[in-house]
Each structure stands twice: as structure tokens, then as C-alpha cells.
A protein has these predicted regions:
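Conserved class I S-adenosyl-L-methionine
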Residues: 39-47
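Conserved beta-strand signature within the Rossmann-like core of class I S-adenosyl-L-methionine
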Residues: 131-139
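A short glycine-rich, Lys/Arg-flanked "PGG" loop and its adjoining helix->strand segment in the class I
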Residues: 118-130
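Conserved SAM-binding loop of SAM-dependent methyltransferases across substrates and taxa
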Residues: 50-61
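Substrate-binding/catalytic lobe of Class I Rossmann-like enzymes that use SAM or dcSAM, i.e.
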Residues: 140-211
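A short acidic, Gly/Pro-enriched loop at the edge of an enzyme's catalytic core
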Residues: 94-103
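Conserved SAM-binding strand-loop segment of SAM-dependent methyltransferases
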Residues: 82-93
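Conserved Class I S-adenosyl-L-methionine-dependent methyltransferase catalytic core
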Residues: 1-34
Length: 211
């Protein structure tokens, strides 16, 4: 009732005058541009959601393996990407085998929990071919409130993402570097998340009003 037509449940990246749908597509394009998959290359998407990124990558001619733990999402993405070079499976990220030119994972790691951050980055490092790139979009917690946040359960952890945790970037970055991954690019767009949330709220309120 509140998502845009792409069914993307993560922050968009807005330019002046963008609709939510246009901003979500802008974000997807930015992710695909950053990983820069070669022609006829391959992409692993960890946590494919409802398939917007997998569809966009498939339309670029990229061979996509998309994984999810939700059977409803799998069915939806299979239908959405029919005719494209996209394979969708019910697979835990720790069970992925094979190597890919790139990995994309958009706001999935928050649901993993701190205990499994190391497993998550190990899975990404293992899946990348030499010279491959990963794009990871995550919601971070400010360094100065990390200790207090970590020691307590807030509303989001209790009711939205049980067991999840926002990312402490220095710790997460160290785990990634321990697996041989190097940090090539960083783009922070917190104000875009605020606008995304506003648009979701407006969509939700309209859906309620429309019955």
C-alpha cells in the first residue's frame, strides 16, 4: 500500500523533481553502475526483495542469480523476470556456491544481526571473482550512539526487524577488510532516506483514505 510500482523496500536516491518511482530507479541504476558488470557478466543479489534490481540487471544483459528466503518473493520475481537471464532461488546467503563478477545486497544486512556480520562478508568475499565488485547498501548507526544502541532493544528491533541491527560502519568495514575486500567507494544519502520515508507515509495515508 505504500511502496512505489517497483516494490522497492529500501531508500531511494532523489534528484530534483523525482517521483518515488524515478528515485528508486535512480538508486538501482547507481548500484548497477558502481559494480560495473562486464558484458555477459554475472551478478549475485543477496536479498532480492520483489525483484526490481534483478529485473533491471537482467534488462542490461547481466546474468543474475537472485536469492531470498521468502517463497512469495521468489514466485513474484520469477514472474517479473520472465524472459530475462535471471535465476531466483530460496537460498541462505551462507549456502551460495559459485563465483560472480559482482555482488549486490540492498538493505538486507540489517536483518542479519551483528552476530552474523562476519558470515555475511565472508559469503560476499567467497562469491566474488578476482577483481569483482560488491555494492552493499545499509543503514548505519552513528558512532557516538553505537554503544547505547547495541545494549538496548529499540522500537524497530522489537516490531519491524526482530533480531536485526543497524550497521556500525567501522566494525563492519574492518570485517570486510579482514576478508580481503577493499573499500573503493562510499556514498551517504541519509536525507534521501528521510524523503523516501515521507513518500511512503504519504502513499500509506492515501491508501487508507481510499479504503
Amino acid at each position: 500500500a505504500w511502496l512505489d510500482p517497483t516494490l522497492t523496500y529500501s531508500s531511494a536516491i532523489f534528484a530534483q523533481g523525482d517521483t518515488l518511482e524515478a528515485a528508486q530507479q535512480r538508486k538501482i541504476d547507481a548500484v548497477l553502475d558502481r559494480v560495473n558488470v562486464p558484458p555477459d557478466g554475472t551478478l549475485l543479489e543477496i536479498g532480492c526483495g520483489w525483484g526490481a534490481l534483478a529485473e533491471a540487471a537482467g534488462k542490461r544483459g547481466i546474468g543474475v542469480r537472485a536469492i531470498t528466503l521468502a517463497s512469495e518473493q521468489q514466485r513474484h520475481v520469477v514472474a517479473r523476470t520472465s524472459g530475462l537471464p535471471v535465476a531466483v532461488s530460496l537460498t541462505d546467503y551462507r549456502d551460495v556456491r559459485g563465483m560472480y563478477d559482482a555482488v549486490a545486497s540492498i538493505e538486507m544486512v540489517e536483518a542479519v544481526g551483528e552476530r552474523y556480520w562476519a558470515d555475511y562478508v565472508k559469503a560476499i568475499a567467497r562469491a566474488l571473482k578476482p577483481g569483482g565488485r560488491a555494492a552493499i547498501q545499509f543503514i548505519k548507526i552513528a558512532d557516538d550512539i553505537w554503544s547505547g544502541y547495541r545494549a538496548n532493544v529499540d522500537f524497530i528491533q522489537a516490531y519491524v526487524f526482530p533480531g536485526g541491527m543497524l550497521i556500525h560502519e567501522p566494525q563492519f568495514r574492518a570485517l570486510a577488510e579482514a576478508e580481503g575486500l577493499t573499500w573503493q567507494d562510499r556514498h551517504a544519502f541519509g536525507l534521501d532516506y528521510a524523503e523516501t520515508l515521507l513518500q511512503w507515509r504519504l502513499n500509506f495515508d492515501k491508501a487508507v483514505a481510499d479504503g
